[in-house]
Structure formats: structure tokens, C-alpha cells
Amino acid sequence: DGATEQLKAEKKEVVVRKSFDDKTTAFDELAGELKAAKVEVIVSTLNDFQALALLQALRKVDHTKVSLLGGDTIKTTDMTKAMGMVEGVYATSPVLEAKEFSTGKPFLEKYIAAYQKPPAYGGHYSYDSMYVLSAAIQKAKSADPQDITKAMHSINGYAPVIGTMTWDDKGEQRYGAVGVYELRGGNWELRMRSDRW
């Protein structure tokens, strides 16, 4: 509802609003509604396979002059099938790719040389978190989870790929960034980051 209010303040109107479970793939009726309402931008929380089904339904009704914006549930390799189906496909994600960090390229080169494949999605965060966890254990001088958690809140943890990891008192990562990506040429390309706008 906050997004709707913000859009109204920008003199933009939400003309179609629907909710679906995480399995629905029958979107023919919705596609007709979107066409009738002349929707140009679709903001979605659908999974990738659902978003693809929606785009296919939009093609059936010849309503392809639209852009789709989703979250990291559509920032997948499967969504590359959406190329050319509509005017634009965008995704936001708090998981920035390793190549977007200055030390990401050497990390990727070493990883691929060692394992002959790229790391799993977000794997560099797991790699970095092991360094931070190790530092917290050393600072806590204990293996007790509560002591480690307390230590993690008090350190500026060195993370070899992303730089640092710090947390607030609720356990949320401080200074996390969200990337906005566009599907172009079969790849997700970073368009902007929240820490740089």
C-alpha cells in the first residue's frame, strides 16, 4: 500500500492489482485485463516461471508494449527466455553479483579455475561470511552462539569480495545495497545500485 501511495504522489495510478499464490501459471484472464486497462508497467512478485507464463499470456493477447519489474525471484537464467517477449524486463536484488565488486573478478577467476564452473547464485556472500564468522569467533574467544552473535554486532567484518559486513542490533546487514538489473542480450545487466543513487 505504501508503494501505491507513493505512485499516487507521482501522479501515477495503479489500475490493476492482483494477488496470486506461488504456483499459479494461468494468466490469460489477467493478460486481458492488463490489455483492457492499457497497462504499460507491471510490478510483480511472481517467481520466474510464473512471470514467463504471464508474458506468454500477454503475447497471446498482443499486449507486449509493457515493461515487467520484479524482484530477485525473476533474476534467474530461466528468465532469459523472456528476451523479446515484451519491451523490458527488470529485476531488483539485494544480492549483487561478484563481478560488480572490485575484488570480484579475481575471486571468480580463482573459483572457476578450482571448480570448473561459476559459484552458485550469491556464493560470494557465503564465502565472505566465513571470514566474518571466523573473526567473530576469534573476538568472542568462544564457540557459544550468543557470544559470537554479540561479537558480530561489534565488528566491522572483513569480507574479501564485497569489502565489509556489519549488522545492526536487529541482525540486519548495514549498508546493504539493492541492484536494479535489466535483461539485455540474454544477460542481467546492472543499471544502478541503491548505494550509488
Q: What is the predicted role of each segment?
A:
Residues 1-197:
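Extracytosolic ligand-binding ectodomains
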